[in-house]
Amino acid sequence: DLYYPIKDNEYISEATYPVAASKWIKENLDLSELKLYNEYNYGSYLLYEGIPVFIDSRCDLYSPEFNGDSKNNVAGRDIFSDALNIAGIAVNYDVKFKEYGVNHIISYSNSKLSMLLSNDEKYRQIYDDGIFKIFSRIATEKTNN
């Protein structure tokens, strides 16, 4: 058989998926208030753990065609492209996070995004397991975040 059911995360690579970080999120953050930015590769795992995501592997659902107002023929946001552009630092991540109301970010520890957030005074690192980092977006009165 090629199908192996998941039993107690036995077949889930902790080097690829945020297994420990997901547990930490569920124990330390209010999921009802969480507006989490995550990278594309592991969004489905977060969703599997019951954590609301910015994007997961169902990329078509994050295209403008599926996020607009079809009744009024208004195209939606291109969340898929925004997610990739944020991860690749092709856009100003802070502007996009404000636009989407993001208050927390999870990213690979060695990613460009994690490196930039670690040095950005608007963000505070609140978790690091050596594979993933989680940042909190610090709201300031001056910018009305």
Predicted feature residues:
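Extracytoplasmic
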Residues: L2-N145
